[in-house]
């Protein structure tokens, strides 16, 4: 493969530096709206759908897309876009199942849902798996950023008389420092508004690059004729080559990846949790899927198509042997003049940073919610005033962001030897998403799914997955659909099918044998030393899992060990656990949504349609989160005392930045005026003299 260095001019570097300084100042400015951990992680649950939709574009498109889809577009043509528009068939499950549940249950992280739905033990294992997933995702992001900027860097750099080789890892370290600065001090509000800006810029830059490329070639007709027929096909070949095939990509990206991105990507989930309501989140998701992703498919893939056309027309300009991961940079440098190339590269790196900063913020949220707080409770430290605790947690969140950034840099080492970012990302998704994907999906949509089933999915399913990774030619081969195994990177994509089947099969098997487990536990409790037996089984399972993990023994022995884990884990979970199906499913599954809404409000839901009213505001004494409107205004809104409302600055272009959620209190007699407390005014960032709109939520 032909690789490049020193692409670009000093003008391009000046443009990029100015761009990044502007972005960091922009993010730091909105960091002033971060007053507590709710703002740091969730943006205060205040934003409008259009702002979140555009912010999601920056995160989704920036999710390594420019580099990896341009690479596959250069190698395979229009079929590179097939993975970019395959989320739609899981969207209804997200819109009407998972999204309302995570909002109405008021969970702050995905593992917290596992505790409410199953048990604290399930939360513990979910935290481990999700942290691995998120840190791995950050590593992929840093890898992509490094590969994007490396072609622009010289091979060596001399500082203070000492020469340094510019390597991938050194580039990644510098990028990580820049990326971590404003996310550490800004939080989710800074990320959302920075991504809003970058979302517009990267869509424009990607489409502008396509226009420049077509103009460079001549016109669209010439471009179309230059592309080989195979490059014009919408789908890849069914089962070849091993590096890019339809069936492997379907299971890796279309199933495991799509559910993983929608259901377990904490960064994406936090964007939706920052919307002001479930309906606003649904609008954002629908617009993203129906309109933004098809446009984005062109934005992220066109550099590869242009590169292939130029390579066919004049191989001396773009060599057919150009490294696929560098094709975006190479094409942009050819078709764009100095300065414009710098702007396009700034958009690329900004898009990638959008993903990384979101993931760092999300992983810090998991750490605070599922490691820091439970650890404090476990150590039984004396609880202090909430405001003091919140300040400490905000400081801990910022320290966690720094530590997670450093860990993400280390994670790059696990992926840097793959031929392309696309294959590294595919392997990552196939390996780390299946256990959590299966657990979330079955937990949300199947009331019968038990703690024993989810724990066995996590432990037994992962044991079987590790065996598949160790012995792919034996265990994954029966599911490979005729794909030839690459011995260097065996079954990067189709392993997702094997892993999903193992986890799904274990979860379903244990759920259907729940009564058998209860019978075994009943018999076990008949022994005098039943507790010792229970602890002995736990010790045996730990030993067997470690043996599978370190590959101690033959395949037949390890497979027997994994099966024994699957059979014994549900017994000990049932023995030691206390599970009430009604308590642990009501309001926590898709079938009990009305109960979830009532719990969210704290009383019966009022769905009567009322008006949205415009109000002036006054500071008044009050309690808690209560605001007071006039009796006439409440009648117009068809609201009662105790209902929930959303107060927002009238200026719609702010997207909900200046807003609060509150509760209707007893009415007063001053029409057109709402009484709020000083703390509510600070939280809503309301400006003196500015009119507010009040909307009843439920």
Q: For the regions a protein language model found, what residue spans apply to each?
A:
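Short glycine-rich, polar/acidic loop-and-turn segments at beta strand-coil junctions
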Residues: 56-60, 70-71, 631-633, 649-651, ...
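Short beta-strand-centered segments at strand-helix junctions
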Residues: 606-648, 659-696
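Short, surface-exposed beta-strand/loop "edge" segments at domain boundaries and coil↔beta transitions
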Residues: 553, 652-657
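Generic "edge-of-domain/loop-turn" microfeature
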Residues: 35, 279-280, 634, 652-654, ...
């Amino acid at each position: 493969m032909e690789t490049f260095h020193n692409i670009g001019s000093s003008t391009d570097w000046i443009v990029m530096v100015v761009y990044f300084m502007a972005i960091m100042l922009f993010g730091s400015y909105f960091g002033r709206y971060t007053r507590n951990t709710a703002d740091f992680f969730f943006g205060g649950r205040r934003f409008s759908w259009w702002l979140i939709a555009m912010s999601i574009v920056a995160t989704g498109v920036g999710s390594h897309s420019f580099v990896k889809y341009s690479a596959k577009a250069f190698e395979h043509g229009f079929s590179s876009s097939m993975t970019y528009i395959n989320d739609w068939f899981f969207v209804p499950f997200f819109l009407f199942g998972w999204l309302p549940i995570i909002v109405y249950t008021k969970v702050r992280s995905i593992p917290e849902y596992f505790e409410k739905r199953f048990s604290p033990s399930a939360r513990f294992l979910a935290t481990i798996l999700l942290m691995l997933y998120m840190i791995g995702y950050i590593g992929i992001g840093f890898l992509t950023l490094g590969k994007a900027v490396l072609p622009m860097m010289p091979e060596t750099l001399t500082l203070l008389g000492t020469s340094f080789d510019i390597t991938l890892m050194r580039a990644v370290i510098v990028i990580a420092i820049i990326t971590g600065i404003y996310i550490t001090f800004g939080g989710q509000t800074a990320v959302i508004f920075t991504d809003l800006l970058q979302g517009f810029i990267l869509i424009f830059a990607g489409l502008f690059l396509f226009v420049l490329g077509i103009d460079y070639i001549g016109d669209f007709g010439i471009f179309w004729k230059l592309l080989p027929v195979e490059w014009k096909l919408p789908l890849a070949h069914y089962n070849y080559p091993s590096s890019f095939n339809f069936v492997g990509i379907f299971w890796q990206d279309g199933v495991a990846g799509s559910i993983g991105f929608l259901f377990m990507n904490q960064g994406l989930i936090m964007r939706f949790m920052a919307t002001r309501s479930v309906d606003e989140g649904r609008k954002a998701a629908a617009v993203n899927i129906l309109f933004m992703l098809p446009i984005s498919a062109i934005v992220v893939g066109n550099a590869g198509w242009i590169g292939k056309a130029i390579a066919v027309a004049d191989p001396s300009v773009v060599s057919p042997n150009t490294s696929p991961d560098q094709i975006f940079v190479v094409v942009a440098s050819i078709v764009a003049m100095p300065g414009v190339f710098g702007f396009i590269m700034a958009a690329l790196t900004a898009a990638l940073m959008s993903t990384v900063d979101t993931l760092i913020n999300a992983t810090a949220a998991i750490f605070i919610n599922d490691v820091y707080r439970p650890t404090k409770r476990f150590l039984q430290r004396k609880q202090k005033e909430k405001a003091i605790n919140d300040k400490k947690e905000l400081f801990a969140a910022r320290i966690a962001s720094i530590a997670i950034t450093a860990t993400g840099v280390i994670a790059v080492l696990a992926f840097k030897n793959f031929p392309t970012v696309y294959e590294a990302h595919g392997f990552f998704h196939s390996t780390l998403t299946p256990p959590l994907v299966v657990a979330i999906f079955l937990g949300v949509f199947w009331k019968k799914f038990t703690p024993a089933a989810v724990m066995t999915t996590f432990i037994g399913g992962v044991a079987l997955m590790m065996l598949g990774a160790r012995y792919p030619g034996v265990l994954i081969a029966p599911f490979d659909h005729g794909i030839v195994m690459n011995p260097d990177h065996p079954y990067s994509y189709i392993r997702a099918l094997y892993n999903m089947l193992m986890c799904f099969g274990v979860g379903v098997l244990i759920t259907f044998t729940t009564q058998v487990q209860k019978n075994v536990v009943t018999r076990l409790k008949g022994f005098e030393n039943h507790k010792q037996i229970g602890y002995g089984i736990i010790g045996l399972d730990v030993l067997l899992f470690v043996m599978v993990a370190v590959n101690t023994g033959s395949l037949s022995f390890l497979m027997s060990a994994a099966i024994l884990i699957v059979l014994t884990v549900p017994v000990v979970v049932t023995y030691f656990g206390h599970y009430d199906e009604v308590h642990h499913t009501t309001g926590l599954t898709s079938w009990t949504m009305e109960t979830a809404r009532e719990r969210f409000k704290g009383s019966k839901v009022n769905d009567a349609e009322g008006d949205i009213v415009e109000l002036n505001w006054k500071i008044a004494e009050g309690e808690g989160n209560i605001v007071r409107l006039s009796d006439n205004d409440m009648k117009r809104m068809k609201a009662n005392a105790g209902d929930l409302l959303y107060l927002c600055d009238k200026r719609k272009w702010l997207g909900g930045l200046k807003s609060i959620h509150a509760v209707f209190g007893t009415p007063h007699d001053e029409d057109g005026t709402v009484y709020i407390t000083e703390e509510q005014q600070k939280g809503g960032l309301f400006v003196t003299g500015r009119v507010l709109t009040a909307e009843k939520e439920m």
